[in-house]
Amino acid sequence: TTALLLAIYEKTGLPVFYGPALASSFGEFPPFVDWTYEQFETMLQGYGNLPYTFPVPQYWTDEFIDWSSQDRGKEPRKNQWICVRPGRAKGRLIGGNLNTMEGFFGTDYMPEIRKGDILFIEDSLKDACTIERSFSLLKLASVFDRVSGVILGKHEKFDDNGTGRKPYEILLEVMGESEIPILAEFDCCHTHPMLTLPIGCEVSLDAEEKTVVLLENPLEKIECSR
């Protein structure tokens, strides 16, 4: 999904919506499917006047139940977003699944990450060694020198390789002396429920207040391009 969405955005300049998948998200049991669908519908059909603050779901889950035998909703866990490094930023939202982005980074289908962008990244079913390598790729490509803030999504079934370290702790170590704001455990990823994010639109990030605010209407941008 990340590859298709970012390629479409790069070739057309139109905002794209990073969000739930048909089977894995909309096929989920209540209550998570209800919240995911509500946020998807809100983003595509209207959310009132801007600015729009993305809501924090009360609960989340990454419990695995085989679809062929699932007969109950997944176990909810108390939810919170985490301020890793305080600060405020405003810029174009860009990003997606980090492992997928690595596969076409630097090609004609990957949008250039510009000065001032807010980078959104998430991943799933990886271990500490793998994401350290992925974060290091971004650092070596000077991505962290260009972006004004980072939003890190929850990591489904993360394997810490016995280190006890969280993905955001590894990110902080890789980034080193960078002082840009970082908000972690954001709910637009492979866990449930899931927000829908308009890639290519301007947002503001306040890591200390744990808020992400949409400043630009994606539907108006699409309409104006016709």
Positions of PLM-derived features:
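Conserved active-site and cofactor/substrate-binding residues in soluble primary-metabolism enzymes
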Residues: 3, 31-35, 92-100, 126-133, ...
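ATP/nucleoside-binding phosphotransfer catalytic cores, i.e., glycine-rich phosphate-binding loops
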Residues: 149-226
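Conserved anion/nucleotide-ligand pocket segment
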Residues: 15-97
